[in-house]
Amino acid sequence: KDGYPMNSEGCKISCVIGNTFCDTECKMLKASSGYCWTLGLACYCEGLPENVEVWDKATNKCG
């Protein structure tokens, strides 16, 4: 699945520019790849395993 990975507080993982950081973060979660979605200033992962939680507007717990 694809989506925004979360940190321990349930927030999207922030990024500013460049994809290397997000690609590394996503691959640690067993995704196929990741990039920095600049408009949202957050990492976005593609090809995540189904059991990895991703950020969802409906269940957002980020302060």
Curated annotation (Swiss-Prot):
Belongs to the long (4 C-C) scorpion toxin superfamily. Sodium channel inhibitor family. Beta subfamily. Residues 1-63 form the LCN-type CS-alpha/beta domain. Has the structural arrangement of an alpha-helix connected to antiparallel beta-sheets by disulfide bonds (CS-alpha/beta). One of its GO terms (biological process) is defense response. The modification Glycine amide is found at residue 63. One of its GO terms (molecular function) is sodium channel inhibitor activity. It comes from Centruroides tecomanus. This is Ct-IT1.
